[in-house]
Amino acid sequence: MNLKKVLTIAFAALLALGGTSAQAQSLSPSTKWHWEKGTIVVDTPTRPAGQQHVLGLKAEKIQTVRVAFVGLGMRGPGAVNRFCHIPGVQIVALCDYEKGRAEACQGYMKKVGLPPADIYFGENGYKELCKRPDIDLVYVATDWDHHFPVAKCALENGKHTAIEVPSAMNLEQCWDLINLSEKTRKHCMILENCCYDYYELR
C-alpha cells in the first residue's frame, strides 16, 4: 500500500472517530446511552405512569384557528404572509425580541385587509403571549436556541404548537416536548418540509 492510501485511510478513520465522539458529547448529561456495534444507542427514559402516547391524537375541531407567531426574523414573516391567505385562520398575536419585526408583519396584515394582531416583544414577550386564553396555536420560528423554551411554554399553557426545525437542541428536550404533548393532549408538530424522501426514510 502506498503512503497516500495509508494517510487517506488514517484520516478517514480519524474523522469517523471524531464524529461519533462529537455525537456522544452532544447528548445531554442526563441522557442514558451505550455503544452497540459501533453505534450510539440511546435508552428510552422511564415514561410517566398512566401517560398515553399521542400517535393518532385528534383534537376537537376549531372553526377559526387563532394563531400566534413567535420569532419574526427569517422564516417567521414568510409564515405570517402565508397564513394571511388561509381560510379559517385568524392571526391574533405577533412576537419578536425586536418590536420592529412584529410591526413589519403587522404592516403586511394591514396591507391585505386583516385586523391588527396584538404585538409582544422583548425577552419575555412570548411568555405573556402564551398566557392568553384566546390562542389555539403557537407557531415558533425563533433562533434555534429558543425553539424549545418557547414551545415548552406554549404547551404548558395549553396551546397546540408548531416548531421550525430543529424542535430541540438535545434528546432530553425532545422527551420534555413529548411528555408535555402527551400530558396536555395538544399537538406538537415539527415543521419539516422534507419528510418522505429516500434520504429521510433510509
List where the protein language model places each region.
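A cross-family glycoside hydrolase active-site/sugar-binding cleft signature
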Residues: 141, 164, 189-191
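N-terminal glycine-/serine-/threonine-rich beta1-alpha1-beta2 phosphate-ribose binding loop
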Residues: 3, 11-14, 22-159, 175, ...
